[in-house]
From Swiss-Prot:
The record marks K5 as: May be the major determinant of the binding affinity for potassium channels. The record marks K19 as: Not important for inhibition of potassium channels. The record marks L9 as: Important for binding to potassium channels. This is Kunitz-type serine protease inhibitor homolog dendrotoxin I. Residues 7-57 form the BPTI/Kunitz inhibitor domain. InterPro entries: Kunitz_BPTI, Kunitz_BPTI_sf, Prtase_inh_Kunz-CS, TFPI/VKTCI-like. Its main location: secreted. Negative results: does not inhibit serine proteases. Keywords: Disulfide bond, Ion channel impairing toxin, Neurotoxin, Potassium channel impairing toxin, Secreted, Toxin, Voltage-gated potassium channel impairing toxin. It comes from the Eukaryota. PROSITE patterns: BPTI_KUNITZ_1, BPTI_KUNITZ_2. The keyword Disulfide bond applies.
Length: 60
């Protein structure tokens, strides 16, 4: 189980048109992965860095 409920949310790029590099926790693979966020919308499973994603969602 991930550390927080936000980590089980599916990747959601949002509904705008920017291309912003971001990271999310992939529940199936149990790891953080990169994706492109649109700049608005989406959900809480979105992080600026892979380190922030790992700190939030992966148990040590």
């Amino acid at each position: 189980q991930p550390l927080r409920k936000l980590c089980i949310l599916h990747r959601n790029p949002g509904r705008c048109y920017q291309k912003i590099p971001a990271f999310y926790y992939n529940q199936k693979k149990k790891q953080c992965e990169g994706f492109t966020w649109s700049g608005c919308g989406g959900n809480s499973n979105r992080f600026k860095t892979i380190e922030e994603c790992r700190r939030t969602c992966i148990r040590k």
